[in-house]
């Protein structure tokens, strides 16, 4: 149940395990629809006075896994990209960042840490183990490369 207005869809059938795509206008920001990540065909639409109010609303909540923006205005696009800390962002497109291995996919904060898909996933879930091995014999590099110590100069004079 929602306190918002179901503008489209809203039906479900347990026998066929189907849920209609649903558009909910102005749900209560405290209800579960607005408090949890949505993994279903439900689209909440909120009425805001301006772009800054929309950005403030998003930023007052846990960071989203993805943010979607539809605009022709470059200034609006840049403001939302820099002002909304989401795992990923799509401008004038939906879900494509999830469907391609060419873009990293993942969240920030409560929606997940890291990024996966394609090369990004391989690197994210691989551990680069640093190993430095120092030989047990004397370090001749200290005598070969500058800056030279007095000990290196004395050895060089004896050899040459």
Model-derived features: where do they sit?
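Short beta-strand segments
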Residues: 6-10, 69-70
